[in-house]
Amino acid sequence: SSPVNFSFRNLELSPNVSTASTPTIADGSMLEKQMLSAHAVAQMQDPVKIWMDRAMMDSKRVLYLNMGSIFFYNREDYDNIVASLEMLHEQVPDILVLWKIGNHPQSVQPIPTLEECNLPSYIRREHWIADVETVLSHPALAAFMHHGGGNSYNEALAHGVPQFCISQWVDTHDIGLYIQHSGVGLWAEKSPKFDPSDMVPKLVRLLKDDYKRFRHSALSWKLKCIQAGGTIGTVDIIENLLKSYDFPDNNSKARIPDAL
């Protein structure tokens, strides 16, 4: 097997280095230009982006709240989060909230529908976020509150966004610990419960009292992501590992005894 190529680690840091998941235009082909143009038009028409643009113009900051696509809210969790956000607003009034809650039947998610919820004006509820990267890269974004999912954690790291984790299951508890120990954010002590007495002080600390420190730490980890190669570097590692492995009889499906 051939050695893994880590040459991408020698890339030069510059404002043009991107850690975004959007493909980089290398050859300037017409198709790629059309795709980029279509993406730009879609962003201009994105109501969430327009709302975040307005927030920035009004000197407001945004807390993005997304507990993941496989998380279902029960009524107690929902009410506790609403209560926590109301208490947060009293102490940090410049914070707006973008809250993504998937549409699910009442039988599995017994909470008010989008039409019924009657939330305060500083909370915007969406059933779907068309472009997460647009949200995470927006200058109005102050922090990302999530369940500790691997995607949420790494995307926030790559964009230099402070994080607040209320971990829910298995590996998400580990990620909550990573967030706290790395200095990029805070982890709810009473996870997986949504306890206002636990949530509100931490959100105030994250978004107000120690915000600059958490932001600085998050940006330093963004730089580390760039230095490690970013998205392109990650793909290179995976491809090189696959290429360096010899599959017997060109079959990647090993027999069970061999796999163990």
PLM region spans:
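Catalytic core of nucleotide-sugar-dependent glycosyltransferases
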Residues: 1-260
